[in-house]
Every structure is written in C-alpha cells, then in structure tokens.
UniProtKB/Swiss-Prot annotation:
Keywords: Cell membrane, Membrane, Transmembrane, Transmembrane helix. This is UPF0344 protein LMHCC_0278. It is a multi-pass membrane protein. It is found in: Cell membrane.
C-alpha cells in the first residue's frame, strides 16, 4: 500500500510542478495554489518513504541512503524551480537538474523495490 501512495504522490508532484510552470504566465493565483498542493504531496512522499525505508535497506543500504538523499534533492529542486519561476528568474538550469534527478530517483526506487508496485 505504501508503494502505491509513494508512486502516486511522486507522479502528482511531477504533474503539478510541470502544470505550475506552464500556468504561471496566465494566473499567479493558480500557480500559488498548485505550489501549496505540491507541498501536501511532499508530506505524503516523506511519510510513505519512511514507511518503506526498511525494505530498501534490506536490498542495499548504500543505495537506500543515496535514494533518500536524491528524494530530498528532488523536493529542493522543485521548490527552487517554482520560487525562481515566481520571481521571474531563468529556470532552465533547475529544469534540467529536475529532469536528471527525477530520472535517477525513479530508477533507484524501482531497483530497490524490485519494480513494485508497477512491475509485480
């Protein structure tokens, strides 16, 4: 169950982040709402990640710690990306970092879980 919550929350974070970036020029109020909803999903990701960490550590404790750090970095990059967008600063660098870090984090997550919940 925690795997599904974790996966759905990560998908929601990615979708909300991309939507917020695209919608900013049209509505700052909607952008702020999406940013706040994103933060609720951070809490879900952190809680579900804590519940699943014991299974990841059994697989490989070094990769589990690295995945935890990558997850924290993803949340930080999303916050920086959205705050730079709100301040109308260039976001290209953070967008590239976001894509790279998300791909690495997702790959590690599926490796450590043996493909669960998507490939079981």
């Amino acid at each position: 169950m925690w795997g599904y919550i974790h996966l759905i929350s990560w998908v929601a974070i990615v979708v909300l982040t991309v939507t917020a970036l695209l919608i900013y020029s049209k509505s700052v109020k909607s952008f702020t709402m999406l940013q706040m909803i994103n933060r609720v999903f951070y809490i879900l990701v952190i809680l579900s990640g804590i519940m699943m960490v014991k299974y990841s550590i059994e697989q490989s404790w070094i990769l589990a710690i690295f995945k935890i750090l990558m997850g924290i970095i993803v949340i930080g990059v999303v916050e920086m990306l959205l705050s730079y967008r709100k301040q109308q600063k260039p976001t290209g660098m953070f967008l590239m970092i976001f894509v790279i870090v998300v791909v690495i984090t997702i790959s590690l997550g599926f490796y450590l879980s043996g493909g669960y919940p998507l490939f079981n």
